[in-house]
């Protein structure tokens, strides 16, 4: 009886170990689409499947982390940061997740990026650091926000200009 019980336990143990080693397959939705849509479950599946978290989209060379930051999908951005996505990647415009999160006043993402050691000294193609992206008066840069919102509204981007206006000084202080 003891031998039979031991054999069952060993077989069960091997079965559990084998299941634990099975690789999760990536979902059908690509990682950038999941980042745009805020589909945290799909992003987590990609992470478990070992998908390339730094895959660049062809238009501007943004990574899923940068995409999540733009669209304000904080949970997705935090999951990608925690999973080891490149926090200092620069797209074709030189923007990084930190510069973008700062400019769009995504405070929780800025905090997470800084905690992981994001480089505050990197500059975009206009020569601006994350701090400089929030240093000018809001009225001087409101048209940039409006252009961004117009371009990305069809994909679901909504910008709260009042929140951005009032949060810019807070973000600037975080970056000092």
Region spans (language model):
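Bacterial N-terminal signal peptides
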Residues: 8-16
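Ankyrin-repeat-protein effector appendages
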Residues: 19-30, 132-176
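Start-of-repeat signature of ankyrin repeats
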Residues: 27, 60-61, 94, 127
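Ankyrin repeat A-helix N-terminal signature
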Residues: 33-38, 67-73, 100-106, 133-141, ...
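Ankyrin-repeat helical core positions
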Residues: 35, 47-48, 69, 81-82, ...
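Ankyrin repeat structural motif
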Residues: 39-47, 73-81, 106-114, 140-148, ...
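Ankyrin repeat boundary/linker residues
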Residues: 57-58, 91, 124
């Amino acid at each position: 009886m003891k031998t039979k019980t031991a054999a069952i336990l060993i077989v069960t143990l091997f079965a559990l170990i084998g299941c634990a080693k099975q690789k999760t397959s990536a979902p059908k939705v690509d990682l950038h689409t999941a980042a745009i849509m805020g589909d945290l479950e799909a992003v987590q599946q990609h992470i478990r499947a070992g998908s390339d978290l730094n895959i660049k989209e062809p238009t501007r060379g943004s990574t899923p982390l940068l995409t999540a930051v733009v669209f304000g999908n904080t949970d997705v951005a935090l999951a990608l940061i925690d999973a080891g996505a490149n926090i200092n990647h620069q797209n074709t415009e030189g923007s990084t997740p930190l510069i973008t999160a700062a400019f769009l006043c995504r405070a929780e993402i800025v905090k997470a990026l800084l905690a992981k050691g994001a480089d505050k000294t990197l500059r975009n193609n206009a020569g601006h650091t994350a701090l400089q992206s929030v240093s000018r008066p809001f009225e001087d840069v409101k048209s940039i926000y409006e252009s961004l919102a117009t371009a990305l509204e069809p994909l679901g981007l909504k910008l709260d200009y009042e929140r951005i206006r009032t949060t810019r000084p807070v973000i600037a202080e975080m970056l000092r």
